[in-house]
A protein has these predicted regions:
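Internal, active-site/partner-interface "lid" segment
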Residues: 107-123
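Active-site loop-to-helix "anion-binding N-cap" substructures in soluble metabolic enzymes
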Residues: 2-4, 14-17, 21-24, 62-69, ...
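Phosphate/diphosphate-binding glycine-rich loops and adjacent basic-rich segments that engage nucleotide
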Residues: 123-173
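Conserved small/polar residues in nucleotide/adenosyl-binding loops
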Residues: 178-181
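A charged helix-plus-loop insertion that forms the helical arch/lid used to bind
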Residues: 54-81, 127-136
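N-terminal glycine-/serine-/threonine-rich phosphate-binding loop
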Residues: 1-46, 55-62
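Short beta-strand segments
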Residues: 9-11, 46-47, 89, 108-113
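Short, active-site-adjacent cap segments at secondary-structure transitions
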Residues: 14-16, 50-54, 115-119
């Protein structure tokens, strides 16, 4: 009998908003994943990266202020960076938890890209909140660069992005290789 595939989705802020919080959250997730593996499941994990991609984007922008010879990192690159380090933390924590239980199964991270419709309605009204809290002055600076900002209920500001509906996962065939019996 083949193992059942279980998909675990770690939603918005499930991994925390700072690197120390993420380390704690990935260890907690690793225990739950190891429980599923012990129960005979093959596990695929999907995760959000909003807080992390915002943090990376902010860090890259701040770095650019003191090192102008470095090129600005577009959001797509920041997203890939966040997938890489989230995947690394999850992969490391899951592998360690499995080994501590005497389970020796491969654990891998796959970075993914999606194809979107460039005319998706989400571009007309961006609403995915990312990054740190901005002052009013910082919000105005972001808007002057062509970025979208929203004022939150508490009077603070944050960057927002469009979140168009994915049409296709570019690496789907690779993902399917890992879920085949």
């Amino acid at each position: 009998m083949s193992e059942k595939i279980t998909v675990v989705a770690l939603g918005h802020r499930a991994l925390g908003t700072t690197l120390p919080e993420q380390k704690i959250a990935t260890k907690k997730a690793a225990k739950a994943v190891a429980d599923l593996v012990e129960a005979g499941n093959r596990v695929v994990i999907s995760h959000s990266n909003g807080p992390q991609v915002g943090m990376i984007h902010t860090a890259m922008n701040e770095f650019g202020k003191t090192h102008p010879d470095y090129t600005f990192a577009p959001m797509s690159v920041c997203s890939a960076m966040s997938q890489g380090y989230i995947g690394y933390d999850l992969q490391t924590a899951i592998r360690a938890e499995l080994i501590s239980r005497g389970i020796y199964k491969p654990v891998a991270t796959i970075l993914t890209q999606v194809v979107i419709d460039p005319y998706d309605d989400a571009f007309a009204e961006p609403e995915k909140i990312i990054g740190r809290v901005l002052t009013e002055e910082e919000a105005e600076t972001e808007e002057s660069k062509g970025n979208f900002v929203t004022k939150l209920a508490d009077g603070t500001y944050k960057r927002i992005l469009a979140a168009p509906k994915p049409q296709k996962i570019v690496e789907l065939e690779t993902c399917l290789l890992y879920t085949s019996p």
